[in-house]
Amino acid sequence: MRQALPLVTRQGDRIAIVSGLRTPFARQATAFHGIPAVDLGKMVVGELLARSEIPADAIEQLVFGQVVQMPEAPNIAREIVLGTGMNVHTDAYSVSRACATSFQAVANVAESLMAGTIRAGIAGGADSSSVLPIGVSKALARVLVDVNKARTTRQRLTLFSRLRLRDLLPVPPAVAEYSTGLRMGDTAEQMAKTYGITREQQDALAHRSHQRAAQAWAEGKLAEEVMTTYVPPYKNPFAEDNNIRGASTLADYAKLRPAFDRKHGSVTAANSTPLTDGAAAVILMTESRAKELGLRPLGYLRTYAFTAIDVWQDMLLGPAWSTPLALERAGLTMADLTLFDMHEAFAAQTLANLQLLGSERFAREVLGCAQATGEVDDAKFNVLGGSIAYGHPFAATGARMITQTLHELRRRGGGFGLVTACAAGGLGAAMVLEAE
């Protein structure tokens, strides 16, 4: 085993996560219909600052992410600074790592803290699947550029005459991998077939996710970390995630048809995470800065790991790669964890990763490790449900998981938690958290 690499500043300060907050998550075209991601980001950061009672000028950096990019606001982070009353001199930039985007934002702020260039920052992400950048065809785009340079009406008409009717149709954002043409659901189907994961197993995991999430809301466990939002026409508050199906039964899941491989598949809309709108953010500081401000941190970021694998086959195995690396850097084993939280993009993807974490063969032949990372204890796994139930605004999910896990660790008296996610492009992310 290599030497552990816990995250501390040059002065020995740990990286403190002081607080975290998110909007409720809304299914596509429901409560946040028409609300762009930048406005969702402003909502959550503004409320996070108001609740924390931290002086606005104490925040020296904001790193924020958005996966579904809006051309009119390419640097969502800077727009949030300008739209929330933060100090205009606050450094702000945007990141994107697909479904692990807010993991990356947190890592970037942590690195600034370790470098000593800042003492406090905000990291997070927002996405809207209801406000999409609808584009134009490549043929129309090329003609429009040429028309802009044409000097006469005749030249412009000649250029437009080259277009066919199909060239005028709007082009929605791509849902497939650029390099392979595969949709995420196609990859989930690959994984189900490769690792022998049945439809019944997938439906059971999805049902478990919804039941746990519904119970978490019923017991008031999420009230402190989810804000109440008001959106036009401002008639009704939106305060709870609207995707959770607490009253569903396993029989309900069995009724749905496969969504991707319609003839032989097992991945359905019910055992996959839905398209979702929402935002989430966390405040990070050096441990000494938190003490100066009289703040008790939610917990600490002990370490993290990012990994990448090939995209052609089973590319959503990021957690099986990033988890052992993060544990090694933290100087921990699976047995040391109090909680283990994995992003549920699909039930098939989640179950495949769990299978490989406990596989001696995968550890030896693929990772080059002497032993398996370890079986994940069901009593520690996604104890409050996961993305299948809550939904998945791509750039916000990591910050949701971090905040949720730290609150639950506090309720349990402290300990270590690991949060991990797969991401498009064969990427993986894992972070080890600590609460006292």
Curated annotation (Swiss-Prot):
Name the record gives this protein: 3-ketoacyl-CoA thiolase
Function text: Catalyzes the final step of fatty acid oxidation in which acetyl-CoA is released and the CoA ester of a fatty acid two carbons shorter is formed.
TM regions (residue ranges): none
UniProt cross-references to InterPro entries, sorted A to Z: Ac-CoA_C-AcTrfase_FadI, Thiolase, Thiolase-like, Thiolase_acyl_enz_int_AS, Thiolase_AS, Thiolase_C, Thiolase_CS, Thiolase_N
Quaternary organization: Heterotetramer of two alpha chains (FadJ) and two beta chains (FadI).
Active site positions, chain numbering: C99 (acyl-thioester intermediate), H392 (proton acceptor), C422 (proton acceptor)
Main location: cytoplasm
Pathway: Lipid metabolism; fatty acid beta-oxidation
GO BP annotation list: fatty acid beta-oxidation
Gene Ontology cellular-component annotations: cytosol
EC number in record: 2.3.1.16
Lineage of producing organism: Bacteria, Pseudomonadati, Pseudomonadota, Gammaproteobacteria, Enterobacterales
Family (UniProt): Belongs to the thiolase-like superfamily. Thiolase family.
Superkingdom to which the source organism belongs: Bacteria
Keyword annotations from UniProtKB, A to Z: Acyltransferase, Cytoplasm, Fatty acid metabolism, Lipid degradation, Lipid metabolism, Transferase
An example molecular function term from Gene Ontology annotations: acetyl-CoA C-acetyltransferase activity
Reactions it catalyzes: an acyl-CoA + acetyl-CoA = a 3-oxoacyl-CoA + CoA
UniProt KW Zinc keyword: no
Location(s), subcellular: Cytoplasm
Top-level EC class: transferase
Gene3D superfamilies, sorted: 3.40.47.10
